[in-house]
Amino acid sequence: LVSEDDSGKWSIIIEEGGMIAMKFTNGYWQVREEITPLYAAEYADCRINGSELTVYAPGKHIASRGDGLNLGMLTVHLTSPMEDVIKVSVRHFEGVQYRGPFVEVAEENPNVRIEETEEEIVYQSGKTRAVIDKRPGSWGIRFCNGDRELTSTGFRNMAYMTNRDTGRHYTVEQLALDVDEYVYGLGERFTPFVKNGQTVEMWNEDGGTASEIAYKNI
């Protein structure tokens, strides 16, 4: 998932092996010359406020006080709008005023459990769990339902990208997709219903087949 700052647009890219390389890297490992990446490298700290969990993820392993100098950080918020659903928000520079787009969300007040051990933090709503890895240099979040892992984010998956040539900034997330696992739907578009291998742009007001607003976006 790629979001450009202040544009209100998300690009959902579904492909095995990390297609986001086409926008920010040459191949899988080499970062394009004009891109400055900030990857979530490890868990640093957290705050619990009622049913909200805030996790701080610096851009590199913090072994000493000096490692915290001139270093960016991603702030990850976990909340639950309804039972069995976990909402994850990734932010950078939270002091900037949010200018929208604003969408009203009908939220409930589910029972949320937050448990912490030396190696992980578990955020649970109903049967759905987000498990945050606390081990040094081992950033990752696993999303599970019961005993089944649904997806995960890990090494170089969550990032904040800056294009130095254009001055544009992007928030990026890559979620694990297993072999023979498919993504369906994503709105009224004249493309195959199975969206694997496609790039799908999502707007709050996305053109439908006969109106300005697509009513089938999921």
Regions found by a protein language model. Give the residues of each.
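Short, Lys/Arg-enriched N-terminal segments with co-localized hydrophobic residues
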Residues: 4-21
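Terminal low-complexity, poorly structured segments
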Residues: 6, 18, 27, 31-34, ...
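Catalytic and substrate-binding clefts that recognize carbohydrates or anionic sugar/phosphate headgroups
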Residues: 22-25, 68-70, 91-93, 111-218
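A low-complexity, Ser/Thr/Gly/Pro-enriched, surface-exposed linker/loop concept
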Residues: 24-64, 70-119
